[in-house]
Amino acid sequence: MYCAASPRHPELLELAVRVGEAIADRGWTLVSGGGNVSAMGAVAAGARSRGGRTVGVIPKALVHRELADTEADELIVTDTMRQRKQVMEDRSDAFLALPGGIGTLEELFESWTAGYLGMHDKPLVLLDPDGHYDGLRRWLDSLVPTGYVAQAALDRLAVTDDVEAALNLCAGIGRNDRDW
C-alpha cells in the first residue's frame, strides 16, 4: 500500500479507512509504510478495525517523524528507504496506491518500472476516485507519441475510482476501467 503520510483531508482519510476495511474483509494482510499518520495510519486502522493483519515497514529515520505504527501486528524497522521498499516489494502480492505526494509517487514509479521491466509480475493499481492523478496521467499519456513512454508501460498500471474494483484488480480480477 502506497499512500500519503502528511495530508489530513477528510475524504482521503475516509478512503484509506474503507480500503483497509476491505483488505481485512478479504482476509488479506496489509503491508504499508509503517507510519501512524495521515492515510498511512488510517488504512492500517481500518484494516485492524475489521480484524485484519497489518505489517508496517518503516526506516528508522522516520520512526519519530511519521510516528511508527506500534499497533501493527508486525513492525519492521529498516536502516534505509531502499530497504523499506525492498521489504515492502518482497512481502506484497500486489501494489495499490492511493492519492499521495512525492513519496507515494516515488514508490509507485519504482514498482511500476520494475513490473514493466519484468522484474515482477504483481498487479499495480492506482485508486484515484477524485482525479488526484489526472494531470500526471495526461502528461504521461502525452509522452507516448514522443517515444519517451511506451504504451505497454502505461498499460501495466490499472487505474480505477472504486475500492472494490481496485482490490479485484489487485487479485488479478477485472480490467482497468480508465483508458490511457
Feature names for model-found ranges:
Residues M1-R53:
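Glycine-rich beta-alpha loop segments
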Residues A4, G35, P59, G100, ...:
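Cofactor-binding loop segments of dinucleotide-utilizing enzymes, especially the Rossmann-like FAD-
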Residues S32-M81:
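Glycine-rich, small/polar surface segments that engage phosphate groups of diverse ligands
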Residues S38-A45, H132-D141:
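Glycine-rich, charge-decorated loop segments at or immediately adjacent to ligand/cofactor-binding or catalytic sites
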Residues I58, L98, L105, W112-R138, ...:
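Short, acidic/small-residue loops that bind anionic groups at enzyme active sites
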Residues Q83-G118, V125, G174-W180:
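Active-site/ligand-binding-proximal alpha/beta "capping" segment
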Residues D90, A94, P145-W180:
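A charged, well-structured terminal subsegment
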